[in-house]
Amino acid sequence: MKENPFYKHFIAHIIILALGFAMIYPILWLITASFKEGNVIFSDPSLFPEVWTLDNYIKGWEGIGIVHFSTFFLNSLFICILCMIINSLFASLTAYAFARLKFPGRKIWFAIMLITLMLPGHVTMIPRYIIFNMFGWINTFYPFIVPKFFGGDAFFIFLMVQFIRSLPKDMDESARIDGCSKFGIYLKIILPLSMPAVITTMLFTFLWTWDDFFSQMIYLNSPSMYTVPMGLRLFLDSTGISSWGPMFAMSVVSLLPCFILFFSLQKYFVQGIATTGIKG
């Protein structure tokens, strides 16, 4: 008996929809819970509230104490935008050197860089803290921004090296014959053609910096310097009195830049991941 493909595809789509709903349900619950009154968030089992209210957003945006949540939001945007631009620029420069230029010890340095991918971030956390403390950078944004100038993110360098190696070298030779310098080749040929990988780097840098809590907790100790993850922590009280409603509301607000950035750059993001062969 011949198997009916309709039922096969129907069952497959049902399973995919069920898995998709299971993955997106926590976000849906977070969004709807942010519109519930504080005393029914955990007692009301329904997904949609009976009474919709914006009080959580108003109270959450007012922040904790004298510091408004807008301060945390702007601090995060400032750090993320600078890190995104600087990291993509200097990571692409470093990747161009590894992929196109010939210099002594290139393979050795590239191998050493790849080895650093195996090191947990916590291994270098204490040495970095000691160095930044010697520089007087504690409670400043410098520990997050300055290291990006040195192309120290091995993951993004490796991603861009893979992309640049896939580009034909004939264009480099033609530009060199026309008198273009090595930096000119990078600026006029390699960088424009590598925009999918550059945008992928920018997107990942923004998301990882925006979500970073551990590093920001170590280096920032003044509420006026707090970022969004640190600001959300202020809604939780160790005594048991926590402002869940405002925290959920500000969590929804904190997701907006990530959603906007991802969906606006989704085409380049998918192209960069597919071309470099990197899987999430």
Put a short name on every predicted segment:
Residues 2-280:
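A structural signal for multi-pass alpha-helical bundles of membrane permease subunits
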